[in-house]
Amino acid sequence: MHSAVGRVSSWLTLMLALAGLVDPARAGELPPPPEKVPDMLMTLELAPVVNGATRRQTIPVRYQQGRASVRREDLENMGVPVPRGNEVWLEERDLPQIELEYDAPRQRLLITVPPTQLKRQYLGAPMRERPRAESGQGALFNYDLYSSHQSDYRYASLWHEARGFGDRGVISTTGRWRQTLSGADTGQSGYLRYDSWWRFHDTDTMNAWQFGDLISGALAWSRSVRMGGIKFARDFSLRPDLVTYPLPTFDGTSAVPGTVDLFVNGYRSRSLEIDPGPFTLTDVPYINGAGEAVVVTKDAQGRRVATTVPFYVTSDLLEAGLADYDLSVGALRRNYARRSMDYGTPAASGVYRYGLNDTLTLETHGELADGLSLAGIGGVMRLGRLGVLNLAASGSQHDEGNGWQQSVGYQYTRSGFNIGVQHSRRDEDFSDLSGLGLEDAVYGRSSTQVNASTALGALGSISAGYFDTRSVDDTRTRLVNLSWNRSLWQRSNLFVSGNRTLDGEGWSVSAQLVLPLGQRGTLSSAIERQPADGGSRQRLEYDRSGPIEGGLGWRLGYDRASQGKDYRQAELSWRGDRVETRVGIFGDRDNTTWWGEATGAVVAMGGDVLLSRQINDAFVLVSTEGQADIPVKYEHRTIGRTDDRGHQLIPWVTPWYQAMVGIDTMGLPPDMQAERVRQPVSVRAGSGYLMRFPVYRVRVAGIRLEMANGEPVPLGSLAVLTDSGAQAPVGYDGLVYFEQLSEHEHLIVTTPNGHACDVELTLPEDDDTRRTPGPYRCELPASASKGHVEKIR
């Protein structure tokens, strides 16, 4: 007993002694942090900060004895320059002029790099996935039915295009039938074929193949011809997003994170965030001619640095490394629009353009036929900010002799000013495919044209032109043109122009005032004076085009002549979804012509045949799966409503361009739903695409479920429709919400505690969505997989 008491007293004595060593004022404080980081090797996950720019991801950092080391690949990914070698981990001593600092409180690694050594940033438009151009399978028949009645002469004509399209290209043929109904036959009655061809586009290579009737490619200093044969060419229209000419780039360097603003000709066009280091700004707007850009960089402290960069841009150049070409081989076509099948000499024609660099584009052209060969070379060169120079020369060998053709031109454009000069000359014996076999062809021996225009601010703009041509028989024509236009009030415009043949009798002068009246149309008035007879004409015209979504339009015009007879015209038009019609009258008091026209198309697509307006290129057929009177939108503009079969055709779609097509479901009743309301689409040239926007009727109901004791089915229970597999959670008061219900449904309900029951639903025949059917009672627990449920009211 005494020993136990002694042990307790010893422990108490020791505890009191220890308590006396502790300062009560410091009893609740933590021990102080170590004054220095331990010398042991640590691997830390730190947020890297390069010249003040924090990276999103963390990287592993080794730290020992005050030195940090970073993996080579992490530095490279951040754009930090590293020396060559095989070392995986690099310390500060391995990185010249680069500092590494461990920020322990904020768990960061501060990396300081000379701005010029950082990886260059290329700031451009975000790369977007190129949309796949679509094409459905189908066919169409365009028509233009026209009839005219003048005095005792009447005739009718029908122009047509029959076209088929699909994944393998487009096939088309055009022609015209004409018949004299009364009066003397002019010899134009009968059928005349124009063009027949098959065309295929390769979107990956931007190449196009065409078989049949074609027009050969040409340069500014050569001429195209009609042929029947094969054509292989580059087609840049397949890529509307592609800029084929060189655009300027703007370089700079930022020491810290900030923003860069680009001002072009005084207008801010871009504002982008940048990281420290050198940068190249490539996201510039589409510009043309001479101009001035100002690049303004701003750091986090608001300091600004502005750099002015002059530039000159022309679309006549090709971007460096880009090629454009056209090769046509076949038989020359003669008497086009006069004979259906008239092909002659076999021939070949080709052009090729290549962007050697951003200032020079080379051009070549060649032609070959029986007894004719031609070759030419040229180039387009940008002269710094001074404009664009073009030069070309070509020579031909022909049975009747050899000849040369030369051309030279200059163009300068800037905001509010433009000037251009072009001169060409050709020998009398120079020949090409366009004149082959045409004995009476007369071509110009030389041609000179000069044009200039400038803006006058509030006074409008003025332009002038001089044209001088000399034919092979030494006939010379010189013409001077002057024009001035100015915007007046509320988008009205005044145009004044004058023309004079230097070897003629005087000036031909005209003035026109155009007054837009908004949705009510356009009113214009003009006066003309002719030097030949010294007479004048006054013209008054009113034009109200039919709305694009359909409707009525008309045009009225009256010409009063000081010498001669007055001229009158009137036209009435109707634009519908299925056809466009026009009727009109024109002429003077003694010679009047009545005419009428109907244009449209018949389209076979998607297992259906429908009527439409004339379709000149691509189109989209919208289908709502039989739901009528639903508004259809193209590029966010309502263009019509679906017909009784749920169709609306959009006949003026721009090919290869991604456009937004959609439907407006705001007017649908609550029991109607659409799977989607808009979708972007790109359609191949000459093709059509069927876009389905399924709109269907749904039976919507909120069903009330009760347990055997009259309490609602527990919150969080899961209800499943056995037929469709649709699931829905049970909410408060035993309510469960389902869409697309039929009159009879089999329902399985599983409570949170795992019990299940079957519910046989018999919904009311009426479709009143405001009612809540039920309650339906579940007997829990259910035996096996089936319980007993009865409707209690």
Task: Report the location of each language-model feature.
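Short Pro-Gly-centered beta-turn/loop motif in secreted/extracellular proteins
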Residues: 62-70, 284-290, 647-661, 665-669, ...
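Feature captures outer-membrane beta-barrel proteins of Gram-negative bacteria and organelles
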Residues: 131-132, 156-168, 188-204, 344-358, ...
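Transmembrane beta-strands of outer-membrane beta-barrel pores
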Residues: 145-151, 168, 177-181, 213-217, ...
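Post-signal-peptide, soluble extracytosolic/periplasmic N-terminal scaffold domains
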Residues: 2-6, 14, 27-246, 531-603
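Short, acidic Ser/Thr/Gly-rich low-complexity loop/linker segments typical of extracellular
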Residues: 637-646, 724-735
